[in-house]
């Protein structure tokens, strides 16, 4: 008996008890399972297509065609494209100086708006403020960003939104600052070819005080002649505040201000934005009443955009282009222009959370099962070999 007991004790010492959770084979198995679950979760993704995908594509295609016909119109006049400053050869980048150039301009911002996908971004913003078919919106434009003007108007066309536009013609560098091809000239070509549904209903000179201050007399006369050529009412008084008031009266003659579904400002026109708040603090994109009141300052002149927004009309502010496109993960001044329908603006790739949750449950359950099994075996081992340890 003593001999058998001794043999049994020797076998116990030679083969010590190891819980399953400490076995190398178990740990290797759990590691392999972890890697397998990770690979499945990582490689199983879903594509979330934007609900407004079709409208975005339509708007971008409209803008592509609109840019093409404007380029052809420009080329018919024997104009050469400056490839250095217009690398995508749109033919729609202005010059650094002209008689109707009002301010300095950011060339890269102008190039960014001459991407048809910018129209798709405008559609996204319009959807954010719940614009629908047959809604009427007020639009404030300048000649500084013809690409952004086109983007807004083609987005309106794609969504069947009614735009009521007032424009200031003066333009900053690289914008629609060619005396023989102003924004009104571009707008007319687009309207005649059915790329946009409406033209501007009135126009001003633009520039400082909205009256062309710092422009030469010849420059101001050229703008006024261009406005007269397009048979538009000229907004020109002796004060900025009166120019703003006249704009409000024109918009009110079409529809009561509170009945407009949105106010869209394109560019930095002083009549549009006024001087009643710090312009640099106004973020691009969707603007609500508090966004204006929080940055207000006393003594300034309230612009048209601010008056609309304070009347609880939703606003879209299309300026500070780099900050704006960062909201949509779009490239700044892209070369070449990206394809329509690609990028997170149209569809976003996401990890499949259901698959990830299932993998987590499988892995967590496996670890729990091994731990539970090990605990039971440890308890049995202690009862068999050291019964007093449980007391």
Positions of predicted regions on the chain:
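N-terminal Lys/Arg-rich, disordered targeting/topogenic segments
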Residues: 3-19, 386-391
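Hydrophobic membrane-insertion alpha-helices, especially the h-region
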Residues: 25-42, 361-364
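Membrane-interface motif at the C-terminal end of an N-terminal transmembrane signal
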Residues: 36-51, 368-376
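Conserved mixed alpha/beta catalytic, RNA-binding, or beta-rich assembly cores of soluble enzyme
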Residues: 158, 164, 171-173, 180-185, ...
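Membrane-embedded segments
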Residues: 117, 123-129, 133-182
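N-terminal, Lys/Arg-enriched amphipathic/low-complexity engagement segments
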Residues: 58-117
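A substrate-binding/cap region within the structured catalytic cores of diverse enzymes
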Residues: 180-259, 263
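C-terminal functional extensions of proteins
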Residues: 269-270, 276-391
